[in-house]
Amino acid sequence: LQERMVKVNVVPDHVDWKYELGEKVKFNVVVTKNRVPQENVTVWYEVAQDMMHPLLKDTIVLENGVLTLDAGTMKTPGFLRCRVWTKYDGRTVEGRATAAFEPEKIKPTAVLPNDFNTFWESAKQENVRIPMNVKLRLLPERCTEKANVYEWNVQNYRLNSRVYGILCVPVKPGKYPALLRVPGAGVRGYAGAIVEAEKGMITLEIGIHGIPVTLEPSVYASLSQGGLYRYQYQNWDNRDEVYYKRVYMGCVRAVDYLCSMKEFDGSNLLVQGGSQGGALAIVTAVLNPRVTGVVSFFPALSDLSGYEKGRAGGWPHLFRDSTDAVEIRKKKLEVSSYYDVANFAKQLKVPVFFYLGYNDMVCPPTSTFSVYNVITSPKEIVIMEEAEHYAYPEHWSQALQWIYSKQGM
């Protein structure tokens, strides 16, 4: 995160950013330069429910340097967001704040298919029949005194299709807990969770695209604009062809591998991820019961159908301002329900560490709260009101300490 000289500071009039239904919220706006409030600055603003079209919008000059906006209220649980922009030195600067209206009462719109569990059980059984065919390649340049580092890959989903990752194993002989780290969206290589392995756990950080994770950065850049461009939107009209079916199975297979290792202690295996990875962490724990805990930061793929009910849905926002024909959209809604994290979260049976930010417009809080609220297993949540689609280092550290505690370290 970079510090900015010019900031648009937007804050609601409740310190905790929380409101009761029907309670009115005011947003206070100040533009600062080097932390000094600026007068006679032109700003433009919008007030909208989470990811919806604006309810209020205007352009105004801050003659005395301060603006107080009466933003109204909400009558149903959710979020009301104020976004304010100004220009400085030819660059647009934005500030935002998001008021929470009884978010603990948000319920998912996603409908659980009658054959949800049957569908995924069948997929797992088909995958089991494919030989794992493990391949490991030592990466001497990444090894340390305490951890051996390998490029790892196994067969997954179909013959000659593979899932790749970086496996790190403590050098000292013994039995160790395991951590599977699943990725956020995008196409990239991975370094592996070496530090965690040095502290005494087996770690496996995987990619999802069926390509090696040790290639040159230019290869991933080319693929992200080529064959893997907009992969997250592929084939949502056929439940067996959705891009994420192979991905979900790859995560299950990664857990299977970790459980097969002679170094594994046999009882402690956590999954960690953020955004797309936050979704995969929850999904993996439901599809593979050997997972013993989950760290999920702002999970994607959450309550995807929200937009069809007039509220925010999760990344990748399949139904936001959709131009699909009615029948196509109906089919995609049906298919998406098999992949929706809200439908998996209802079945979680292991402890969960959850994180979200109110200002997140990638994985909006309406969608992530709809997931958190249906989790019935032991859970704890960290809310960073001002955070957009990121977490501060302190929160990643907090999550890691939670992992260590669950691993008995």
PLM regions: where:
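Gly/Ser-rich "nucleophile elbow"/oxyanion-hole loop immediately N-terminal to the catalytic nucleophile
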Residues: R230-G274
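Proline/serine/threonine-rich low-complexity linkers at boundaries of modular beta-sandwich domains
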Residues: L1-V8
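Short beta-strand elements
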Residues: G90-A110
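Short beta-strand/loop motif that positions the catalytic acidic residue
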Residues: L348, F354-L356
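Cap/lid segment of the alpha/beta-hydrolase catalytic domain
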Residues: R188-M249, G306-W315
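C-terminal catalytic histidine-bearing segment of alpha/beta-hydrolase fold enzymes
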Residues: V362, F369-M409
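Hydrolase active-site cap/lid region
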Residues: G278-I328, I383, A391-E394
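N-terminal cap/lid segment of alpha/beta-hydrolase-fold proteins
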Residues: D13-W17, N127-P173
